[in-house]
Amino acid sequence: MNVRHLINSRPLAICCLVFLMLVLTACGGGGSGGSSREGASASPPAADPCDATSDPEDGVCRPVAVRVDARAPTPFTEDGRPVSLEVVIFKPPGEGRYPTVVFHHGSTGNGSDRSLFGQTFVSATLTRYFVERGWLVAFPQRRGRGRSDGLYDEGFRLDRSGYSCREDLALAGAERALDDLDAVTDWLQGRADVDTTRMLVGGTSRGGILALAHVARRPEVYRGALNFVGGWIAEGCGDHRAINQRLFAEGAGFPGPTLWLYGTRDSFYSVPYSRTGFDVFTVAGGLGAFHVLTPAPGDNGHFVINDPSLWAGTIEDY
């Protein structure tokens, strides 16, 4: 599949428009439970000087996107109250239906810092890449994350002190997350600005492995999946192989192409480890391409999403 074939040919009308400049959180999609690996800082690179609605040009942040803060209804209730999910949408200015990428966040490291649960995840670099090519980008926040309702309960230890390395608890958390992905997908398909014939799903870290498992469950909706450094539990965790390989193998049920993007010096998943997950996926019948990205010296490969020079050409050819 070639992403360029999904893009409208009409140019973007970006002139004489003024947009509210909002400071957006570009973190919170980091690790995936357990201890990080040695050899790289677990912190993301410095924040982009422009937010997701603008692009740096000659030292000035040039407006490129319209931001929409929305809420997706779900079939879930907690304590007798309906649960809705925060969805941050960026799209080109003007009316119309746009090819859409739904991009899912990761975890919060090891799950022990509750102050991170309320941070809303968006990616300015990914947004600019897609919006400038005529796409709508949606960033859903799963239950208990960002400004979404509900309890954040994606595979915690029984005392909720952090993410669990136990296979049963971790996979139960993944199933809960996949239910959220289903609810958001259903809601997006009803929006007037979404071209439901041209949709991709993607994510980073936990969001990446969720995108693979989800696309196999909704092949009638999505044309492909973008997996940035995907995994559910870090390779330092006890049951990591059983957990991650189970979810990767599930993604093999999708009949279309998938794209796997992993960085060297990743503090949670080494390249050989991630390639083993890809092998499990392909042996199970999955279709995909595995790419190794090399970030700048000293940068943590788990945050390659922040450097489009590493992956823009690869996605363009996908």
Locate each region found by the language model.
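C-terminal motif of bacterial Sec signal peptides marking the signal peptidase cleavage site
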Residues: 24-26
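Bacterial signal peptide processing site
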Residues: 28-31
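N-terminal cap/lid segment of alpha/beta-hydrolase-fold proteins
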Residues: 47-96
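Short substrate-entry loop that stabilizes the transition state in hydrolases
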Residues: 96-98, 107-149, 234, 268
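Alpha/beta-hydrolase active-site loop
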Residues: 155-192
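Primarily recognizes the serine-hydrolase "nucleophile elbow" in alpha/beta-hydrolase
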Residues: 179-253
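The feature captures the conserved acid-bearing segment of alpha/beta-hydrolase catalytic domains
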Residues: 224, 229-289
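C-terminal catalytic histidine-bearing segment of alpha/beta-hydrolase fold enzymes
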Residues: 284-318
